[in-house]
Amino acid sequence: MASGKEIRTKIGSIKNTQKITSAMEMVAASKMRKAQDRMEVGKPYARRMREVVGHIAAGNLEYQHLYITEREVKRVGYIVVSTDRGLCGGLNVNLFKAVLRHSKEWADKGIETDFCMVGAKGTAFFKSVGANIVASLRDIGEQPSITSLIGSVKVMLDAFADGKIDRLYVCSNDFVNTMTQTPKVERLLPLKPEDGAIHKRSWDYLYEPDAKELLDGLMVRYIESQVFQAVVENGACEQAARMIAMKSATDNAGNLINELQLAYNKARQAAITQELSEIVGGAAAV
């Protein structure tokens, strides 16, 4: 059994760590609320943009945009949104597993994949597994902007336009609630018509000044809005996961302190009992 002094040192060290994890939990909770607000602000725009392009994909276009036209899949691209920092539980690991499963389905068909990484953790992981990373972005901060994402997104859009990839997906975490974040892999390009409910109320558009000019701009805005919303939502997921992870660490530290305190009391009791035994034994000898 460890000595009382050693146990006291361990208890002191764990208490210091507990203070840190407790502070990180509170900071993450505050950041999560702000990230949730940003996520909710952008959702209506992203959702409406998705509806509009869904209608367009289902309509009879006078101009068939490249992003709407289906073609034979020879190469697939992924935009993977991860975090720059760790200490957020299994958030990144679960996402990476989902992406690997999805990409393996294409690999089994003999189709190669390219990756655009957003977040340092994703870049490090996919480099370690030998993935072909064509673009990467890190240190986007807690308040990302569309302008900071344009460069990486443009790499994938140019690749699609040049025929280097024939299908593009965005991969991120979906914020269900504070306790639950689920990985998702969504198809970005080519656009596919929305579900039957939208088909029933779909319509054709009149384009001014002309369909090509309007759709060329609209499609790029659509991709940017979907990727940006994925980044913002992933940020909320990160803070929620970190808050839960730090709460779990704080609780575990408390349990460990209680166990060590009990061990310390037992060690102290044993030491006192031994001293009394020695005193009694010495007195009896006299």
Curated annotation (Swiss-Prot):
Keywords: ATP synthesis, Cell inner membrane, Cell membrane, CF(1), Hydrogen ion transport, Ion transport, Membrane, Transport. One of its GO terms (biological process) is proton motive force-driven plasma membrane ATP synthesis. CDD domains: F1-ATPase_gamma. Gene3D superfamilies: 3.40.1380.10, ATP synthase, gamma subunit, helix hairpin domain (1.10.287.80). It is a peripheral membrane protein. The keyword Zinc-finger does not apply. Signal peptide: none annotated. It is found in: Cell inner membrane. Pfam families: ATP-synt. GO terms for cellular component: plasma membrane; proton-transporting ATP synthase complex. GO terms for molecular function: ATP binding; proton-transporting ATP synthase activity, rotational mechanism. F-type ATPases have 2 components, CF(1) - the catalytic core - and CF(0) - the membrane proton channel. CF(1) has five subunits: alpha(3), beta(3), gamma(1), delta(1), epsilon(1). CF(0) has three main subunits: a, b and c. Belongs to the ATPase gamma chain family. Produces ATP from ADP in the presence of a proton gradient across the membrane. The gamma chain is believed to be important in regulating ATPase activity and the flow of protons through the CF(0) complex. PANTHER family: ATP SYNTHASE GAMMA CHAIN, ATP SYNTHASE SUBUNIT GAMMA, MITOCHONDRIAL. This is ATP synthase gamma chain.
